[in-house]
Amino acid sequence: MVREKITVSTRTLQWKCVESAADSKRLLYGRFILSPLMKGQADTIGIAMRRALLGEIEGTCITRAKSEKISHEYSTIMGIQESVHEILMNLKEIVLRSNLYGTCEASICVRGPGYVTAQDIILPPYVEILDNTQHIASLTEPIELVIGLQIEKNRGYLIKAPNTFQDGSYPIDPVFMPVRNANHSIHSYENGNKEILFLEIWTNGSLTPKEALYEASRNLIDLLIPFLHTKEENLNLEGNQHMVPLPPFTFYDKLAKLTKNKKKMALKSIFIDQSELPPRIYNCLKRSNIYTLLDLLNNSQEDLMKMEHFRIEDVKQILGILEKNFVIDLPKNKF
């Protein structure tokens, strides 16, 4: 077995890219290290960076399609091989890169027979397509396909509300996440007193892993800057205030709860994004308000299978992670 060797700084905290690869235009990979870190620091940074990479970076997606030929999402159009639903799913997969703020319009206008691909989308100059070969539809007859598109830049994901089809326009569930997956690992040295943080990043091509690392770091810094101010700022918020009611709370109440149920609190403090779940499973759980290990254990395998877009393979993967990392299991049914 050949062990990998890397050169790290002995004093100054430094980062560098130790590996990069392009599997395709829509799948880029990068591996980075940060060192030297004191014991415990690598995990602190790694968890925060993974969450920022998956949830804090903006992406550009097609969010709505409009055509007079669409009667409903699962209809078919004479002369087009794919159903409307399949066309919408193909549009959802188009990877875009932009300097867009908010939303803009685009369109498709093609006459068959022939294949409709991403290169047939007419875009504003500040939006570009990463892979022009991405398939949209197959026209089998000499018909004209005209589709109006709405493009949006945002972060995270959006779920369309039911029954939102109107005037030949249909929303597309966008996933504004340029980072497909992110993992972190830790290598200890000097008798466990020093650590090297390894970050692995996979992107959809709209950002390179290095660009994603920069964006995530900048967003984290922006969130923490207010804490660097030595005094609380009394901003003039007249006309822009919102009162949030809070439940009664004392230190002793909190201490009593911690003492009473230490195991429950421990499970509640472990967030699901610390479990190296794939982004798709992670997002499905978040949509069902499952954020911690305690939330997850309050559900059975049967409950998970009732969630939208959840598959038996996803449940098996969760069971494997729970067994490997926490030596616990999910019941098949609620008792």
From Swiss-Prot:
<dbReference type="Pfam" id="PF03118">
    <property type="entry name" value="RNA_pol_A_CTD"/>
</dbReference>
<dbReference type="Pfam" id="PF01000">
    <property type="entry name" value="RNA_pol_A_bac"/>
</dbReference>
<dbReference type="GO" id="GO:0046983">
    <property type="term" value="F:protein dimerization activity"/>
</dbReference>
<keyword id="KW-0150">Chloroplast</keyword>
<protein>
    <recommendedName>
        <fullName>DNA-directed RNA polymerase subunit alpha</fullName>
        <ecNumber>2.7.7.6</ecNumber>
    </recommendedName>
</protein>
<feature type="region of interest" description="Alpha N-terminal domain (alpha-NTD)">
    <location>
        <begin position="1"/>
        <end position="231"/>
    </location>
</feature>
<dbReference type="GO" id="GO:0009507">
    <property type="term" value="C:chloroplast"/>
</dbReference>
<comment type="function">
    <text>DNA-dependent RNA polymerase catalyzes the transcription of DNA into RNA using the four ribonucleoside triphosphates as substrates.</text>
</comment>
<dbReference type="GO" id="GO:0003677">
    <property type="term" value="F:DNA binding"/>
</dbReference>
<dbReference type="InterPro" id="IPR036643">
    <property type="entry name" value="RNApol_insert_sf"/>
</dbReference>
<feature type="region of interest" description="Alpha C-terminal domain (alpha-CTD)">
    <location>
        <begin position="263"/>
        <end position="335"/>
    </location>
</feature>
<keyword id="KW-0808">Transferase</keyword>
<keyword id="KW-0804">Transcription</keyword>
<dbReference type="Pfam" id="PF01193">
    <property type="entry name" value="RNA_pol_L"/>
</dbReference>
<keyword id="KW-0934">Plastid</keyword>
<dbReference type="GO" id="GO:0006351">
    <property type="term" value="P:DNA-templated transcription"/>
</dbReference>
<dbReference type="GO" id="GO:0003899">
    <property type="term" value="F:DNA-directed RNA polymerase activity"/>
</dbReference>
<keyword id="KW-0548">Nucleotidyltransferase</keyword>
<comment type="subunit">
    <text>In plastids the minimal PEP RNA polymerase catalytic core is composed of four subunits: alpha, beta, beta', and beta''. When a (nuclear-encoded) sigma factor is associated with the core the holoenzyme is formed, which can initiate transcription.</text>
</comment>
<dbReference type="InterPro" id="IPR011262">
    <property type="entry name" value="DNA-dir_RNA_pol_insert"/>
</dbReference>
<keyword id="KW-0240">DNA-directed RNA polymerase</keyword>
<dbReference type="InterPro" id="IPR011260">
    <property type="entry name" value="RNAP_asu_C"/>
</dbReference>
<dbReference type="InterPro" id="IPR036603">
    <property type="entry name" value="RBP11-like"/>
</dbReference>
<dbReference type="GO" id="GO:0005739">
    <property type="term" value="C:mitochondrion"/>
</dbReference>
<dbReference type="InterPro" id="IPR011263">
    <property type="entry name" value="DNA-dir_RNA_pol_RpoA/D/Rpb3"/>
</dbReference>
<dbReference type="GO" id="GO:0000428">
    <property type="term" value="C:DNA-directed RNA polymerase complex"/>
</dbReference>
<dbReference type="InterPro" id="IPR011773">
    <property type="entry name" value="DNA-dir_RpoA"/>
</dbReference>
<comment type="similarity">
    <text>Belongs to the RNA polymerase alpha chain family.</text>
</comment>
